[in-house]
Amino acid sequence: ADCLNEGDWCADWSGPSCCGEMWCSCPGFGKCRCKK
């Protein structure tokens, strides 16, 4: 997959980015997930 789906774990500093208009949300402790 070239992009990550909603709810997928992500890293705002590397790796594939979130699909479409979603962004990598990091609520804390480095645990980031794609959100719309």
UniProtKB/Swiss-Prot annotation:
PROSITE patterns: MU_AGATOXIN. Pfam families: Toxin_7. It is found in: Secreted. GO terms for cellular component: extracellular region. Disulfide bonds join 3-19, 10-24, 18-34, 26-32. Signal peptide: none annotated. Keywords: Disulfide bond, Ion channel impairing toxin, Knottin, Neurotoxin, Secreted, Toxin, Voltage-gated sodium channel impairing toxin. Its main location: secreted. Expressed by the venom gland. GO terms for molecular function: sodium channel inhibitor activity; toxin activity. One of its GO terms (biological process) is envenomation resulting in negative regulation of voltage-gated sodium channel activity in another organism. Belongs to the neurotoxin 07 (Beta/delta-agtx) family. The presence of a 'disulfide through disulfide knot' structurally defines this protein as a knottin. Binds at site 4 of sodium channels (Nav) and inhibits the fast inactivation of cockroach channels. This toxin is active only on insects. Has a potent activity against S.litura larvae. This is Delta-amaurobitoxin-Pl1c. It comes from Pireneitega luctuosa.
